[in-house]
Amino acid sequence: MTNQEPQLLFFFDEDLPAKSRNVRFKYGPVEHLGPRVVGDTRQDHSAASMFCSKIFTLEDGTYRMYYWSYGSLCCEDPKESMPRGLVATSTDLLNWEKPDLGQVQLDGKDTNLLHIEGLELDIVVGCSQVRISENHWRYYFWGCERDTRLWALLAADSEDGLHFKMINDGRGLLYHPPLPECGPLLCDVAKKLKHDPEEYERDMTLRVNRLQSNDASTVYYHPDRGFEIFHQYLVENRPESGRVVDVPYNCPAFLRVMARRRSDDGIHWGLPELIIVPDEKDPWDQQFYGMPVCDYAGWRIGLLLHFRTEAGQQTCYVEQAFSRDGTNWSRPLRGHWFEGAHPEDAGGIYPAGDALIDDGDSWLIYYTGVCTSHDIVNETDWKQSACAVRVPKNRLLAVAADEVVGEFMTEPIFLSQDEIKIDATIRGWLRAELCDVFGNKLAGHHLMDFDQISGDDTDAVLTWKGSNTAEYRYKPVCIRFELLDAELYCVKY
C-alpha cells in the first residue's frame, strides 16, 4: 500500500463545527523571543523594520533577511535620515549579522545598505521580495516614481538577490492615493513638471485611481498562480456608515479594508478584489492595515493586521484569517492573537511578509515591534525593532472546552491512514466516536468503546478498546468528539 503523509483537518472556518455544544475557538500559544535585529548602526538608526519584508533560505542552508529602516542616517547631512533597504544574514533564523555588501559606504566604511541601480531618489519603504527562479529575484518597494515623484510601488530585479536594477523605467506599478493627507496632489506635481495641470490630472488621476494601493502591501509569486499582492485599500468613509471617527488620526475620511490583485508578470496588475471589509461582527471603529499570507495544508493563512481608531486604541495587532482560494476569508476570532511582551513592541506589532516561517516542529513569526501607537510618533523615543515569536506547528487555532463537557462533529473526511491522530492539549479528558457521513455510530467505535486520553500530545492516537481505524481506510467518516478542559488543534488522518 502506498505510503503517504496524513491529511490535516483544521478548524479554520468562520463558524464552529457541526453539532457544537459548549465549545469555543481559542488561539494557540506563542513564545516571545524578543528583538532579533535592532537599529544600532548609523545605517539603520533606531529603526530595523521587517514589516512586509521577508526571509529566504539560501542554497548553502543559511538565511537572508531583507529589512528596511526609516531612520537610516545615510545622507550628506549626518543628522538627516532617509528610508533605505538593508540585509542581514543568519545560520539559525534567530541570531543575525549585518554583512558588508560593498555597495554603500558611510564614513569610508562598507555597510549592509542595498544600492538599487537606476533609482532616482534613494528612498525605500515597505519592501517586499519574491524569488521567481534560482537566478531571478525581484525587490518591490515604495518610493518616488521617476519624474513625477508620486508615491508608488516600484520594482527592481537581480540575479543574486543583492545587486538590484530598476525595471519598468522607474514608473510606478501601483500608487498611494494622492490625497493631501497621504501624499502630493496630482495638480501640484503637474505644475512642478511644467505640464498642463488639467490634462495631466485627468490622465494620471485615472491611472492612479485604477492602480490605487497603500504602502502596507506584500507581494507573492507562485509558479501556478503567478503574482499576487495583498494590500490595504482606502474607501470613502461616509457619515452614514457609522464608522466615521471624530478624533485626529491620519486619513479620517477613509476606511482601510483589505484587497488582493493578481498579475501574470508582476508589473501589470489587474483590478483589486476587496477581500476583507469590517462587518457587523467588528467594532464600529475597526480598520485593517495589512495582511501577510502563506500557504499550508491547502489553506491560505493570513496574519490580518488591525487597529481601532477611537482615541487611545490605535495599537496595531494581528488576528488570524483563513482562506481556500485567496478571495473568501474566514475570521473565526475577531480579536488580536498576542500582544507585545517587551518595551520594543509595546505600541504595536506589524508582521513580516512571510507570515509563518518553517522552523522544524514550530513556526517563527517575525514582525516589527514599535514602542508607540499608530497615531503617535514620538521622535525622541520612537524605535522599530525586528522581533519574533515561536508558535508550535499546527497549533494556530483550537476548538476548546472549559469546565463543562463540550462536543462537536467533524465534516466528512476520507481516512488516508490506518490510524487517526490528534494534536491536542487535554488537562481533563477527551473521547471520540466514529460515525458514518450521516452521523450514525459505527459498530465497535462508540464513545463508550473509546480509550479515553489526556495530556499534551501532538500525535495522540485514537483507539477503541485497543483497535485503530484501519478497516475504514479510504472510506468517508465523521468523528464526534467530547472533551473537558481541553484544546483540540488538528486531526491527522
Predicted features along the sequence, with ranges:
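Beta-rich carbohydrate-recognition and catalytic domains
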Residues: 1-286, 295-347, 367-493
